[in-house]
Amino acid sequence: MSGYQNGGPRGLADDSDVEEEALVADYREQVQYEEGMDDPDMGLAQQTDDIQSRLVAAAQPLDFSAPLEVKFQSYDQYCSLFHFILNSDGPVDLEPPSYYWAWDVIDEFIYQFNSFSSYRMRIARQANNEEEAQILRENPNTWGCYSVLNVLYSLIQRSQILEQLQAMKRNEDPMAVAGDYGSRSLYRMLGYFSIIGLLRVHCLLGDFSLALRTLDDIELNKKAMFARVMAAHFTTYYYVGFSYMMVRRYADAIRMFSHILVYVSRTKNFQKNAQYDSITKKNDQMLALIAICVAFHPTRLDDTIHTALREKFGDQLLKLQRGGPESLPVYEELFRTACPKFISPVPPDFDNPEANVDPIEHHLSVFMDEVKTNMWSPTVKSYLRLYTTMDLKKLAGFLSVKPEELRSWLLVNKQRTKQLRWADHGLLDGELVNVSDLDYAMQGDLIHISEAKVGRKLVDWYLRNLSRTYV
């Protein structure tokens, strides 16, 4: 691992030398070549065939019910493969088995990391399988966050994919900065999809801002490399949209979810493979997230999405739009249905099962705090729309709350109507805009209200529906 240590995850550079050396030593033990790889008598052709078979095997899904021993073996095999790719003397002269291979490897690598972390947390919390708990206790770094992040960052650094993407943005030749490794398809594609992998891992760990920051050098458009692989396309927009939702940028989240759902609906007749079929099963999750975002930020949706949303979550959406305590269980249900399977960045405490907090429950709690803050928003706005000026105490009487509590809520809500909206640069950047059609200002106890309604574009509506009728 020392050969590509500079590619390790950010924020770990300040660790003590002793701790770093321990991690390096532990990692080296875990990435030894499989038996026979160092045999000098093995022919070059036999070695090449063995590596090719390992490349193919790395992209194959692991059975969900695989025993713990198999999960450990899978981790060792991944470590061995990435060690060979990253630490060989010079770039490995191999071509990927297929165009989709690099994505499949990164996708499966992160899936197994996610699955193992969830399994380990479940064993620790249940405390009813002492044998497996002891094995997991003795191997805390197997499928650890440090190892997984280090592999992804190392693949990105070795391939110099960030430099290549930056050169492409400047309309320069990316091969001029690719180097010996980045000029080869194997490294370039692994490095590129490792960026998407980092987006996913940081989101699973709950660092949503860093997740968005990882895509600074990737342009979200149809020409991007990830858009050529349907599963990568779907995954990218799902995690970007979810990260936006968790940092309260609901307009941008709706934009991301809408893009991929419309794309899926328009291409379903052209793609008939197992990968596509598995993606379409996740559409309900995306619709559930859109329902949540629309409740926070009412907006017009594409007709296709609006129709699907009404069919799948019509009753729930109505409760969300009404607000109040009745909406809380609906928010919780939709969030559990559609959120990623969050993981903890550290191994669980097997000796104190009750001290382990379920990561999903933790993020649900954070999300529900935001929901409770906005719970009365629909009711308050329904009153404000009826007036141009209104006394604070009068509105407080309608809502049966104390005037000062209402004042605090109005100030917080007004602040949150100002949101960043992504335009063109980094995903965390954007223009500060008012995302609500209802605005108000407070002068002492007097509330001044203004409403800006955008007229419906009937011409566009007629054209869309006429094209559906006659096409």
Swiss-Prot record:
Record domain PCI: where: 252-446
Oligomeric form and interacting partners: Component of the eukaryotic translation initiation factor 3 (eIF-3) complex.
PROSITE patterns named among the record's database cross-references: PCI
Recorded superkingdom: Eukaryota
Keyword tags: Cytoplasm, Initiation factor, Protein biosynthesis
PANTHER family: EUKARYOTIC TRANSLATION INITIATION FACTOR 3, EUKARYOTIC TRANSLATION INITIATION FACTOR 3 SUBUNIT L
Subcellular location, principal: cytoplasm
UniProt protein name: Eukaryotic translation initiation factor 3 subunit L
InterPro entries reported in the protein's UniProt record: eIF3l (IPR019382), PCI_dom (IPR000717)
GO cellular component: eukaryotic 43S preinitiation complex; eukaryotic 48S preinitiation complex; eukaryotic translation initiation factor 3 complex
Gene Ontology biological process terms, A to Z: formation of cytoplasmic translation initiation complex
Function recorded in the entry: Component of the eukaryotic translation initiation factor 3 (eIF-3) complex, which is involved in protein synthesis of a specialized repertoire of mRNAs and, together with other initiation factors, stimulates binding of mRNA and methionyl-tRNAi to the 40S ribosome. The eIF-3 complex specifically targets and initiates translation of a subset of mRNAs involved in cell proliferation.
Transmembrane regions listed in the UniProt entry: none
Subcellular location: Cytoplasm
Family statement: Belongs to the eIF-3 subunit L family.
An MF annotation (GO) of this entry: translation initiation factor activity
Organism: Pyricularia oryzae (strain 70-15 / ATCC MYA-4617 / FGSC 8958) (Rice blast fungus)
